[in-house]
Amino acid sequence: MNPMQGPRSIGGSSTEVNQVDGESIYCTETSLNTMLNPADTGFPNNSTPSGRPTYASSSSHAAQDHTWWRFGESSSIPGPSDQVNSIGIKTSHQLPQDGTHHFVGYGSEGRQTGLNGMMVDGGVHAGSHIRNVPSFLRGSSSNPMPQHVDMSMDMDSDNCNAQTSGVVIRHNSYGSSLGSSVQAAGESSSGPASPFGGWGSSCKRKALEGSPSHYFSGETPNRIVQTENSASHASLSQYGASSSLSLATPSQSSPNVTNHFGRTEQMFGSGGGRAVAASAFHSTRNTDTLSRAGRRLNPRQPQESVAFSVSHGGTSVRPTGSLQQNLPLNSPFVDPPDVRSSSITSGSNTGENQTNIVHLPALTRNIHQYAWDASFSSRASNPSGIGMPAERLGPQWETPRSNQEQPLFAPATDMRQPVHDLWNFARGSPGSSVDSLFVPRAGPSSAIHTPQPNPTWIPPQNAPPHNPSRTSELSPWSLFPSIESPSASHGGPLPLLPAGPSVSSNEVTMPSSSNSRSHRSRHRRSGLLLERQNELLHLRHIGRSLAADGNGRNQIISEIRQVLHAMRRGENLRVEDYMVFDPLIYQGMTDMHDRHREMRLDVDNMSYEELLALGERIGDVSTGLSEEVILKAMKQHKHTSSSPSSVELHQNIEPCCICQEEYVEGDNLGTLKCGHEFHKDCIKQWVMIKNLCPICKTEALKTP
């Protein structure tokens, strides 16, 4: 036994009567494994000299009455000193003012079991038979009151293999040092002040709330620790359960309780128990890894220390050792996982406040402990920030223990004022999430999963907030931001956020709208550039066309110059040469000699049959001359190649265009009025049909 823990109450009993779902069950040498019924009971005042624990127990061989405890403050209701619980122990509103450990145990006589349950430094410790004792701890002191919630599992083997468990909660009003305030179960606090000095002088007696995150008016929620035990399993056989954290819905067979809003909710789940610790805590320090090994509440059996590591890069808390342990059915941590949805409202009178509760199923004895500090506000309805400053993360986190204790936590959502702190397990930027809730996630793997690296703090869709406009007052919590801040990268503390409303949804959407505008401007600029490129291409095409036109014009000009030079030299020009100057000239020249221009028919589009019919209709139309007229008017001579002049002329004369034969020596040639020469017989036949030059289309022979 740890000498710091002091004596423990030991009782014995071989017979118990347990009540499960209204039926009495006779059990010999077995621990209490029943569904606890909530009752309103205050804490007894058993003051003893300083430094010694006080024991108050109630033993009975009949069905036992189990109570629910809640610490609170109120000045309008009678204190617990005027109340007597159902088992006859009168409670007092006075709390010890020294370091005395008060243990209230409910059990059977004649049994020897390990004491565990709920213990407050200088406060109350629930005995071995108290299970399913959710405590609603409310602080009323204006001074900061660091809290350290330790959830541990104790698996002791005694007469009936009684398995007990519980929750250890420490309140230290004398200081805020994390290293000195985190104590093992049963260790005495070393603070000079009273552990309960900051608490109110009275306790409210109210029904158990359906959700641990429901807070009463005038109270400051800081820690909600709930352990539940189910009696749906009939046997006490142990089974191996992997320590996993997953999500499930509450069992339908669970009894219902009514919260202070009048809303009925399920309190228990089927198959095992669950442990929940809820609080709205924040962190003012960014650490890469939080690893901690706890201490077993009753160190009767040595166990292996297993350290969990929470990193900003991962999504789960992974142990360094094995977590496979055999867990009895009556262990309060054996239960299907359950997560309850949460809704946020700004007011405490009209809205329903729920929170996301993470239940830890099938957790073994090797459960680690996260310690945090809490600061209570003086008689205020709003929760104050719970910080984990850098200077408080001392060697206490690095010192391995022989046992592991770990609370499961869910945040309180009754946020009526902006919270100034951030909760960060890992280093990062505080602006990674805005207007969000702490939603721990779970998975079916063997490792205990922690919140995802970059969670979105969004209320569940099935429970929308009653006043969404006030949700912006929530602090921008950031669990695992992916963006590292310069101070966090150097190991320094993360600066606190300023007070005031946080960024609204409109401001959050501003970067996306600016991005869209930048994209639109980029598209607009790209369109303008494309238009300019098209214009440049068009200009290039026009330039090429102009260059081609210029080349054509230059060619035409050169041809005209050649024709002019030929005319100046007196050379014979053809009709094509005149067409160079103007195409209309050639058209006028052809029309000039067409006497029957008005009588012309469009023979180009006429078929062969139409042309034959036209010839028969018109008849033979002859414009030629007779042979006698031709012989008289046409000049005739013989072609000779012997004379130099004839040789030179012969070289320049083209062949006969009618018969396409070259002129030979001694051929009779005929010369027309225009000067063109042909064979005499060829041109005579041509002029007899048509009095036109076959080359220039001018009048061949002049008639009298």
Curated annotation (Swiss-Prot):
Pfam families: zf-RING_2 (PF13639). Keywords: Flowering, Metal-binding, Transferase, Ubl conjugation pathway, Zinc, Zinc-finger. Interacts with MED25 and UBC11. E3 ubiquitin-protein ligase that functions as a regulator of MED25 stability by targeting MED25 for degradation in a RING-H2-dependent way. Proteasome-dependent degradation of MED25 seems to activate its function as positive regulator of FLOWERING LOCUS T (FT) and is important to induce the expression of FT and consequently to promote flowering. The gene is MBR1. A zinc finger (RING-type) spans 656-697. Pathway: Protein modification; protein ubiquitination. The RING-type zinc finger domain mediates binding to an E2 ubiquitin-conjugating enzyme. Belongs to the RING-type zinc finger family. It catalyses: S-ubiquitinyl-[E2 ubiquitin-conjugating enzyme]-L-cysteine + [acceptor protein]-L-lysine = [E2 ubiquitin-conjugating enzyme]-L-cysteine + N(6)-ubiquitinyl-[acceptor protein]-L-lysine. InterPro entries: MBR1/2-like, Znf_RING, Znf_RING/FYVE/PHD. This is E3 ubiquitin-protein ligase MBR1. The keyword Metal-binding applies. Residues 184-196, 245-255, 485-505 have a biased composition (Low complexity). Disruption phenotype: No visible phenotype under normal growth conditions, but the double mutant plants mbr1-1 and mbr2-1 show delayed flowering. Residues 43-61, 281-290, 300-329, 340-354 have a biased composition (Polar residues). The keyword NAD does not apply. GO terms for biological process: flower development; proteasome-mediated ubiquitin-dependent protein catabolic process; protein ubiquitination; vegetative to reproductive phase transition of meristem. Its EC number is 2.3.2.27. GO terms for molecular function: ubiquitin protein ligase activity; zinc ion binding. Residues 452-467 have a biased composition (Pro residues).
